Regions:
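N-proximal low-complexity "stem/linker" segments adjacent to membrane-targeting elements
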Residues: 1-62, 92-93, 98-99
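Terminal low-complexity segments of carbohydrate-biosynthetic enzymes
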Residues: 12-15, 49-50, 54-56, 292-296, ...
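Short, flexible/disordered intra-domain loops and linkers
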Residues: 20, 52-60, 100-104, 137-150, ...
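Active-site-proximal specificity loops/subdomain of glycosyltransferases
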Residues: 54-122, 146
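Short aromatic/hydrophobic "clamp" motif used to bind/position activated sugar donors
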Residues: 127
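Catalytic beta-strand/loop signature of glycosyltransferases that borders the donor
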Residues: 130-131, 285-293
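Acidic donor-binding loop at a coil-to-helix junction in glycosyltransferase catalytic cores
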Residues: 267-273
């Protein structure tokens, strides 16, 4: 690990609730001592999209002074700043128009690439991506209630990123669009099992899908991960080292080993596509969790309200049409990428 570290924290966001999530994370960084470490400089990169939920720039840039005082540098990446930067790159012959469009235009991949670019420009050593619908905590399931615990996400990544190109943490909560389906004569469990088995691979398996569905669409944290400091190297499966796009740290000290993000037009999957580029990179799974609140059920968590049970993502046949189609699209996208690079 370097003696003096410039740590970047990147958010690609478009939600009005971003400020609340940011506050929770910054107080988490203070609680674990990172905001007071003189050899660690915290640099915040916020790439925001005003069209996603009809927000204003001030929804992202108007950060409370008590929070900014705990951060060393802050970079807000809006459309205007990015367009000026793209123009400079085009005029300087650094990128062609086609390359700039591929890299900086369209979807979450473009927002993540903007953060990557400004992090490299500011000589950031390590860059951590966090999502605006994830919180630094883990939830486990006991016999009668769920149990909550705080997680030192940044601190855990910092402990291990010096020995890797990428470190990736774990996720709990609502991490996939797979609902709890009420099977019936029209859509039987056996029908759905046969479909899953038809597209299955090392990542998509019926036993995993059934387990998530059995928990009402909720993924609980693995207690063995929480009670040990075990770090695992991510092995390559069918040409991919599968990672997620958040709770993700990238070692920027050797820029030639850093890969950009990509997603197809009007689609997601930027983390899966990046996974296919990592054959020559060392990727570690590190022992920290974030809770994914995909349906915004649990914003009160950030005010200290800890529920004793989690809502099930129910889906009877009346709603299963769209929900199952969404699940199928998600699984089919993953399967397509795996097949392309097999």
């Amino acid at each position: 690990m370097k003696k003096n570290i410039k740590l970047g924290i990147g958010f690609a966001t478009g939600r009005k609730s971003f400020q609340i999530v940011l506050k929770t994370n910054i107080f988490n960084w203070r609680e674990c001592g990172l905001t007071e470490k003189e050899n660690v400089k915290l640099n915040l990169f916020i790439a925001y999209d005003l069209k996603y939920s009809n927000t204003r720039a001030s929804d992202y840039t108007n950060v409370n002074e008590k929070l900014t005082d705990l951060i060393d540098e802050t970079c807000f990446i809006g459309a205007g700043l990015l367009e000026r930067e793209i123009e400079e790159l085009l005029v300087g012959g650094v990128l062609t128009k086609a390359e700039a469009t591929l890299f900086f235009k369209g979807g979450y991949a473009a927002k993540r690439n903007a953060i990557l670019y400004f992090a490299l420009k500011n000589h950031i050593d390590y860059l951590i991506f966090l999502d605006d619908d994830e919180y630094p905590m883990a939830v486990t399931n006991s016999r009668t209630t769920v149990l909550w615990g705080g997680q030192h996400v940044l601190k855990t990544h910092l402990q291990h990123i010096g020995n890797a190109d990428i470190t990736n943490g774990h996720h709990c909560g609502y991490i996939s669009p797979i609902p709890q389906i009420a099977f019936n004569d029209i859509l039987t469990e056996d029908d759905f099992r046969l479909f899953i088995e038809a597209i299955s691979n090392d990542i998509i398996r019926w036993d995993k899908i059934k387990s998530v569905m059995g928990n009402g669409g909720v993924t609980y944290a693995d207690k063995s991960v929480l009670t040990t400091d075990a770090v695992e190297e991510v092995n390559e499966i069918n040409g991919a080292k599968f990672i997620s796009g958040s709770n993700l740290c990238i070692n920027m000290t050797v820029p030639s080993r850093v890969h950009p993000f990509y997603n197809p037009p009007k689609a997601r999957g930027e983390d899966t596509f990046l996974s296919t580029c990592l054959s020559g990179n060392k990727v570690l799974r590190v022992p920290c969790y974030t809770f994914h609140d995909a349906f915004s059920f649990y914003k009160p968590l950030m005010n200290g309200v800890l529920p004793i049970s989690l809502k099930k993502n129910h889906c009877g046949f009346n709603c299963s049409h769209n929900a199952v189609l969404q699940s199928v699209y998600w699984m089919d996208s993953l399967q397509t990428v795996v097949t392309l690079y097999h």
